[in-house]
Regions:
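Sec-dependent N-terminal signal peptides
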Residues: 4-13
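Extracellular acidic, Ser/Thr/Pro-rich low-complexity tracts
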Residues: 40-45, 55-57, 89
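Short glycine/proline/serine/threonine-rich loop/turn segments at secondary-structure transition edges
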Residues: 91-99
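Short, compositionally biased
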Residues: 11, 18-20, 100-205, 249, ...
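Structural beta-strand segments of beta-rich domains
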Residues: 32-36
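Glycine-centered tight-turn motifs at strand-turn-strand junctions
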Residues: 58-90
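Short aromatic-cysteine micro-motif
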Residues: 131, 137-148, 171-276, 307-330, ...
Length: 414
């Protein structure tokens, strides 16, 4: 039996682009299926429309839907639209007067927190939280193999202290000089390290060392050369120029988002620290209180003290440890992650002013090496901090299984 469904509306705001508005909403329910129609007012451009499932005015604290179809969680043009969704078993069945749906319209320069790219079809969807991801949310391995989940990092206007403080017991002063960094834009960052399944879906081959395990598709791509990811090695001179046939170029062509690339060194560290200035999540500094630190990193990452299986250290499935405060997994350990910047020591930040949107040194101080971050399954704890950096050869055949990647892109919909 169909009946009206109580509806709550919310509108996102943006400073530069006109914000579309949702109106003329009509809903009907049939068992656990909800059908919704709405219109998007014409501000001169399309907008992203998302939904939340509410119970007594609050978002359900579980994955909301098993599936959705129609014009929702995507970029839509002004006009009339419809969509439907099936409420997941973990949520209460729709009830008139208690259940609500909140529709939100987002400007294209201020998209939702989560973006998901279908690596097979190229479809792009946006979601307000991981609870909005259909079919089980992040627990479904679909989001580790055939889809790529990106998290918007709130960087616009933010300033943070990059590098390590003098209280960190194993700091490498010459490559971790503390300095202020500011950003002018938000950006998206991969929730997970790029997996072998995702790598194969984009490049058609598996170059990883640990590719013959039962769960290999969900393990991070390892033994990854930077040249396979972006091709050209002319950063920062040529910006985000990519070579045809590289992974980022293929991904951008498939989904229409051409800003996919590696993060900069500053972007990676800002995303890793997630609002703190610490070596590890939950405010853990790498000081003399070793017990607390070891306890912290074991909860958040795979490194040389906990990664062994049958006596052999190895990478593990992504997302098995706790995420940081911004929902990013495996920022400490598992595989070391390439960033764009040239590896250079004793960089000069002596003027005291924040460096804005830094792109790194114009050249490497160590034989053309680029920076890798986060440590790996074979690294010691001190090499898995938020500020430790290491130089590796751009296309070296001697990378080892500890090299991987986490993708980034602009948080602006084109």
């Amino acid at each position: 039996m169909k009946s009206n469904l109580a509806l709550l509306l919310a509108f996102a705001s943006a400073s530069a682009f006109a914000v579309p508005q949702v109106g003329n909403v009509r809903t009907a329910i049939n068992g656990r299926t909800v059908n919704v129609t709405y219109s998007l007012a014409d501000p001169g451009e399309p907008g992203i429309v998302t939904f939340e499932l509410l119970y007594r005015g609050e978002a359900e604290n579980a994955v909301w839907t098993t599936e959705t179809s129609g014009d929702i969680n995507k970029l839509v043009d002004p006009g009339s639209h419809s969509f439907s969704f099936t409420v997941a078993d973990g949520c209460r069945a729709p009830q008139v007067g208690r259940t609500g749906v909140r529709l939100t319209a987002w400007a294209t320069n201020a998209p939702p927190d989560y973006m998901v790219v279908d690596l097979l079809q190229g479809d792009v969807r946006w979601y307000v939280s991981t609870n909005a991801l259909p079919a089980g949310g992040l627990t479904n391995d679909l989001y580790r193999t055939d889809k790529l989940v990106m998290r918007r990092i709130p960087a616009a206007g933010a300033t943070f202290s990059m590098g390590s403080g003098p209280y960190e017991i194993s700091r490498v002063a010459k490559s971790e000089i503390a300095h202020e960094v500011s950003f002018t834009e938000d950006f998206y960052m991969g929730v997970f390290e790029l997996t072998q399944g995702q790598y194969v879906n984009l490049l058609g081959v598996n170059d990883s060392t640990w590719k013959n395990e039962e769960d290999s598709p969900c393990r991070p791509a390892d033994t990854v050369s930077m040249s396979k990811i972006r091709g050209t090695k002319t950063w920062p001179k040529d910006g985000h120029l990519l070579t045809d046939g590289c992974l980022c170029k293929i991904l951008g062509s498939r989904c229409g988002i051409t800003s996919f690339d590696l993060p900069t060194d500053a972007q990676w560290e800002f995303a890793c620290k997630a609002g703190s200035d610490c070596a590890f999540p939950n405010g853990a500094h790498q000081d003399s209180n070793g017990g607390a630190i070891y306890g912290t990193i074991k909860k958040y990452g795979w490194y040389n003290a906990n990664s062994a299986v049958n006596g052999t250290m190895q990478p593990h499935r992504v997302g098995e440890k706790l995420p940081n405060a911004w929902g990013l997994y495996d920022m400490h350990g598992n595989v070391m992650e390439w960033v764009l910047d040239n590896y250079s020591i004793n960089a000069n930040y002596s003027d005291g002013s924040p460096v804005v949107d830094p792109v790194g040194a114009s050249a490497s101080s160590d034989d053309g090496k680029r920076i890798c971050r986060g440590g790996s399954f074979g690294a010691s704890m001190d090499k898995c901090t938020s500020f430790y950096r290491e130089g590796r050869g751009y296309g070296s055949a001697l990378l080892g299984a500890g090299n991987g990647v986490r993708l980034a892109c602009r948080a602006v919909v084109k």
